[in-house]
Amino acid sequence: MPKFDVSKRDLERLVGKTFSVEEWEDLFLYAKCELDDVWEENGEIYFKADSKDTNRPDLWSAEGIARQIRFALGFQKGLPKYEIEKSDVVVYVDEKLKDIRPYGVYAIVEGLNIDEEALRQMINLQEKVALTFGRRRREVAIGIFDFDKVKPPIYYRAAEKTEKFVPLGYDEEMTLEEILEKHEKGREYGHLIKDKPYYPLLVDSEGKVLSMPPVINSETTGRVTTETKNVFVDITGWDLNKVMLALNVVVTALAERGGKIKSVKVVYPDFEIETPDLTPKEFEVELDYIRKLAGLELSDGEIKELLERMMYEVELENRRAKLRYPAFRDDIMHARDVLEDVLIAYGYNEIEPEEPKLAVQGRGDKFIEFEDAVRELMVGFGLQEVMTFNLTNREAQYDRMNLPCGEHQEECRDYFNHPPAELVEIENPISPKWSALRNWLIPSLLDFLSQNTHEEYPQKLFEVGKATLIDESRETKTVSESKLAVALAHPRVTFTEAKEILEGVMRHLGFEYELEEAEHPSFIPGRVGKIIVNGETIGVIGEIHPAVLENWGIEMPVAAFELFLAPLYTEPYL
């Protein structure tokens, strides 16, 4: 969870009222934070805020916390208002960036009065949003520049690796390749672009470099100081919705410091947009649902008042609430999310506890204990556990795995359930990247390896996780199966090394098994087999096909296996 430092004096300046340290401990709860530490430095009191919500990047700075508290205390109600003035600035996006880092969104914020604490919060917000929400700059990277040093129009273009500029913190030019090799940020984030044919570059009309997203800003325009009055904000990434949200978070935080927001026209090869877009989002909720789940006898008017203190605009109609909420939020997906805000405004400490009417005695789930035992076993074999997302997409599950499914479902076939021919897909996904539930785990491990090619080898991974399969006999038409997957990556890895770990698993769990040679496009022919226990095929083992490794951008050989855990579930776990 994000942690960051804030000044008590700065928070109180933004809220408009002073409080004791004890009062601040309670106030932080309105912003879904806990007060982790308090200390004094040069006569100033500082807090370490520990955010408890990874879906609210708008609360990861002093500006966001202060805004939330102002509304929660009733100093303001309803939607926060931000005006956007249209500028004549245009950013042109190069078509060559489509497969490199396709999306950039931009804004101008003018009239800032930046002191040292405001500058520290600006840098903190950049770093926390890019690190956590942006997954270490892979999905979101942020640049803030001194706009007075920039000459529009601006170009987000593909650059040759031999082009030069002075990176932030240096006083001499370096080529883009040299930056990735020698600059601290280049070594840290260069793996995100180093294998691309071109590198992204943001330049103005005079050819002056602003930044090399997502790695480093230029020294010329990318150093913001307390003397800076007008800034240009740049957000790049792979998902347009995600970079738009990050832009909304940053510009509204700067507006809390008195800045005036101006929009920028962004011209893509096949469409144009004006950014930022702060149009409020909409949602509807049944008031009786709120009352029932809250367990509180709240009137319609009380629910309305509580929601207005959480930055909603509320219209009551036919026992329902039509809601509009700020564009810097993207976490309202269900009525329960609205209920959470109602309870935060009401105050969890104000809810009277009740003793359960039915005495129950809990115990651990036996199958979960079995899964934990398997995890301990794998750690004992020297493997590192990873926990990846259940949500994925068809490309990752089939296309990148060299399987003939893609968009043509009729071409799919069942590779002894690794993977099955059918994929559970989401009807209206928020992002194409998260458009399906995975039906096998090896692609998730390869994705992890592809994101860590800059780390040392060998890399030996395992995951105990869920795969979702079609099952027409069930009410939901699906079933989630627990599986074990292992991936080994280093220059000398072989089928035998993976087989030795598989043998260790079977021996410790008390099972005899057989391997039967099989055909599977994800693996090298002749080096792949079915895992058979009690006459039933429960998994697959083999060396990953070079075409698959190339699809994932992995340069090391990989051996892997995957199997269902349920057939191995016996005493003493039953």
From Swiss-Prot:
HAMAP family: Phe_tRNA_synth_beta2. It catalyses: tRNA(Phe) + L-phenylalanine + ATP = L-phenylalanyl-tRNA(Phe) + AMP + diphosphate + H(+). It is found in: Cytoplasm. PROSITE patterns: B5 (PS51483). It comes from the Archaea. Tetramer of two alpha and two beta subunits. The keyword Cell membrane does not apply. GO terms for biological process: phenylalanyl-tRNA aminoacylation. Its cofactor is Mg(2+). Keywords: Aminoacyl-tRNA synthetase, ATP-binding, Cytoplasm, Ligase, Magnesium, Metal-binding, Nucleotide-binding, Protein biosynthesis. Belongs to the phenylalanyl-tRNA synthetase beta subunit family. Type 2 subfamily. Its main location: cytoplasm. One of its GO terms (molecular function) is RNA binding. Optimum temperature is 95 degrees Celsius. PANTHER family: PHENYLALANINE--TRNA LIGASE BETA SUBUNIT (PTHR10947:SF0), PHENYLALANYL-TRNA SYNTHETASE BETA CHAIN AND LEUCINE-RICH REPEAT-CONTAINING PROTEIN 47 (PTHR10947). Mg(2+) binds at D331, D337, E340, D341. It comes from Thermococcus kodakarensis (strain ATCC BAA-918 / JCM 12380 / KOD1). This is Phenylalanine--tRNA ligase beta subunit. It is an enzyme of class 6 (ligase). One of its GO terms (cellular component) is phenylalanine-tRNA ligase complex. Coiled coil: none annotated. NCBIfam families: pheT_arch. The lineage of its organism: Archaea, Methanobacteriati, Methanobacteriota, Thermococci, Thermococcales.
